[in-house]
Amino acid sequence: MSFQAELVACFGQPVAENPTGAMQEAAFRAVGLDWRYLTVEVAPDALGDAVRGARAFGMRGFNLTIPHKVAVIEHLDEIAPEAAVIGAVNTVRRDAAGRLIGENTDGKGFLRGVRQDAGVDPKGLRAVVLGAGGAARAIVTELALAGVSQVLVVNRSHERGESLAADLSVKTATPIRFESWSGVYRVPADAGIFVNATSIGLFPAVDDMPAVDFADASSTLLVCDAVFNPPETRLLASARSRGLAVLDGLSMLVYQGVIGFELWTGLPAPEQVMKDALRKALSQSA
């Protein structure tokens, strides 16, 4: 018998409302692993100390959330190619030699949800992504690598939107173009996937909704929202009322966690257990 548990963690600020720990610990229990997931508030000027602590504790890995996804890179031994393209890390794994490797599972989690939950193959489709922050960078990168015909980045800030489009267009060899967002954005008829990669509609501002209009949208459009709390945002309700297929932010959160679990443990993740645990955690915090 051993009383020593393996450790993984989440470093961020703030983290009190981050439900990932409930999902991961349910998964550990389901497969019989004596592992613990620690949710730790880490200020920006303490991030280096936190990573050194993770090394000292022999942690199997850790997640990063706001504001550490970019700043953590200088403290790691290596980053995966996709994370290098995105320019951000949300998951770190410890390899057999004890080196800390940075990964980005946000975009991969989104893409797995598109394929598995929505049943859509993005290859050849035209994608529209609202926003130009970290989530948008990850989603645009993975859509480009999955073979979409074009990505349209729609953002209110010209500088951020143009920078993201220009940078990722070169890095992924995919046509990525910026379009300014002012007033109400009309989703074009030739779009196959629309993604809200902003935080508009996130709890507690559940009555907020991106200023978009689906009047011209194709009946085959898939509408996705990266906001996971609440799962049914006003944006998704609006799309659903028009008969459009939707994909909620829980899908992205679960699947990025599934990928992280598999990177840390080397075991297949109990996906349904993780989905159920996340829904339960969010319902209790509502």
Where are these regions (language model features)?
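Residues at the starts of beta-strands that form the adenosine-phosphate
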Residues: 7, 36, 126, 149-151
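Glycine-rich adenosine-cofactor-binding loop
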Residues: 12, 104-107, 114-118, 123-145, ...
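Short glycine-rich anion-binding loops that position phosphate/pyrophosphate groups of nucleotides
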Residues: 60, 66-71, 134, 199-202, ...
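Rossmann-like adenosine-cofactor binding region
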Residues: 173-246
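Adenosine-phosphate binding glycine-rich loop
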Residues: 124, 222, 226-286
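Conserved S-adenosyl-L-methionine
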Residues: 144-150, 241-245
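NAD(P)-binding Rossmann-fold cofactor-contacting core
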Residues: 146-171
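Phosphate/diphosphate ligand-binding glycine-rich loop within oxidoreductases
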Residues: 2-118
